């Protein structure tokens, strides 16, 4: 038998075994993205070493507890021993999900990541357990993040979790996303000012509501806030939202209230003076709300239940207006939206039939400018 075919025959069992037991971590050919899925009952955690060259890293823990790593490494008091290794990492974006992690381990890792160039951190489907260690010195020693995203993360300290986590991050956070939170009733007296935060996204918290929004928007803790997203956040009235914003002292330029069931409001809203973009799509509105800001750059009223075109005087002065997907433009759209929404599905906005190469929005704008 020729040597080369013979060698291939000998390797076949190894190749078959390799396909049957794939590595939990995969690094792409450009050393940019690395994804680990430790879903096996006894995962090979050492496979994560493959991700050391990557810029974007995702670690999915398969629901396992990371308690064993707390016993193996003292990241809290002896973090400098890891400094050289962490400084060499290229990672800029890190996602960790589906694990149970002891609080000392999580905060210890954050402290070690202070030596890294990490800019974006996302935690998803995580249960933080145990008691946190004492806070670090006054100067924060954690990573200098620009973006922090948290989805379905449970903390052992209730409303104090944000202030506790904040102590382990360097100042300068610009974007904060919190979805499916177990509590947003923060201990505001303990929360430090987010002086650089321009974007706050509290979407996908249906139990929040206007009262919860007052507790979440700690007064005068978000002085630089420009973009506020509250999609599917249990908002009921525009007046209630406006009151919460006023109490918190925030002046967002962009406000997203889409996917909330808004009802008709008898009280007029005192809008933030800086507001120039308002998204009210998928809110079930049957008419244009009264008391909208006098002037907006962007107003999105698409995918609602408007049965007629807005009348003169109902709309503010607006540069970019979207009314696509309303019943007066798309016959049957209202019934379709109601059926899908009741089933828990948020449909894509139906396209408007208006216009020969022109979107319904642009076509309507041309007609609307006569009475705006």
Swiss-Prot record:
LRR repeats lie at residues 54-82, 83-118, 119-145, 146-173, 174-197, 198-225, 226-252, 253-275, 276-296, 297-318, 319-346. Residues 343-372 form a propeptide. The keyword Repeat applies. Gene3D superfamilies: Ribonuclease Inhibitor. Its main location: membrane. It is found in: Cell membrane; Secreted; Membrane raft; Golgi apparatus. Glycans are attached at residues 37, 152, 279, 320. It is a lipid-anchor; GPI-anchor. One of its GO terms (cellular component) is extracellular region. GO terms for biological process: cellular response to diacyl bacterial lipopeptide; cellular response to lipopolysaccharide; cellular response to triacyl bacterial lipopeptide; inflammatory response; innate immune response; positive regulation of lipopolysaccharide-mediated signaling pathway; positive regulation of toll-like receptor 4 signaling pathway; positive regulation of tumor necrosis factor production. Residues 287-372 are annotated as: Required for response to bacterial lipopolysaccharide (LPS). Disulfide bonds join 25-36, 34-51, 188-218, 242-269. InterPro entries: LRR_dom_sf, Monocyte_diff_Ag_CD14. Belongs to the lipopolysaccharide (LPS) receptor, a multi-protein complex containing at least CD14, LY96 and TLR4. Interacts with LPS-bound LPB. Interacts with LPAR1. Interacts with the TLR2:TLR6 or TLR2:TLR1 heterodimers; upon interaction with ligands such as diacylated lipopeptides and triacylated lipopeptides, respectively. Interacts with MYO18A. Interacts with FSTL1. This is Monocyte differentiation antigen CD14. It comes from Oryctolagus cuniculus.
